[in-house]
């Protein structure tokens, strides 16, 4: 299964981002969606899991909450908008209820800067990811999305690419 990961569209889904996500079986939007029309457009490609960002309000109904915990192909995700929202420590997390299993993948948006960590830097998850931003990027990478291939409970490949399709980081 290929998962497309996008964030910070702020109401403007770049046609190149839409085209880049066309090969995905599921799409995760990590907040600052900017309007229900963005989700409707993404849903023409694949099922969408979305969370609210600090610029999103109640117009999404049940389509987006503050956190999402999808399990896709046996891989557990924790999705929130701000990096601090998805921080998990021994003291717990606002994003996880007591007794919830730890995620395999933590995803956030908000910073507009792509980030991909594995190993000890990603703890307690195996992978920590920010896809960057489709609107107003704050890095020299430009506008970015991420993709992940998962199968039978395993993350096979993860990468961040710019909207020209150039792979910028991978694990």
Positions of PLM-derived features:
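Short, solvent-exposed aromatic-acidic interface loops
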Residues: 158-170
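N-terminal active-site segment of His-dependent metallophosphoesterases
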Residues: 1-48, 60-67, 74, 141-144, ...
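Flexible, charged surface loops at secondary-structure boundaries
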Residues: 19-23, 71, 99-102, 123
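Glycine/small-residue-rich loop that forms an oxyanion/phosphate-binding "nest" at active or ligand-binding sites
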Residues: 52-58, 62-102
């Amino acid at each position: 299964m290929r998962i497309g990961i996008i964030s910070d569209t702020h109401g403007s889904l770049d046609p190149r981002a839409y085209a880049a996500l066309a090969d995905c079986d599921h799409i995760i939007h990590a907040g600052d969606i900017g309007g229900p029309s963005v989700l409707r457009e993404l849903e023409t490609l694949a099922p969408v899991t979305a969370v609210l960002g600090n610029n999103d309000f109640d117009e999404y109904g049940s389509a987006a909450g503050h956190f999402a915990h999808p399990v896709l192909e046996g891989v557990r995700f924790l999705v929130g908008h701000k990096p601090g929202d998805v921080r998990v420590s021994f003291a717990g997390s606002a994003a996880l209820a007591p007794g919830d299993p730890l995620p395999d993948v933590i995803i956030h948006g908000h910073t507009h800067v792509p980030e991909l960590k594995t190993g000890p830097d990603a703890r307690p998850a195996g992978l920590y990811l920010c896809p960057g931003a489709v609107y107003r990027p704050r890095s020299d990478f430009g506008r970015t999305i991420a993709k992940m291939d998962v199968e039978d409970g395993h993350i096979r490949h993860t990468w961040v690419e710019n909207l020209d399709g150039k792979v910028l980081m991978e694990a």
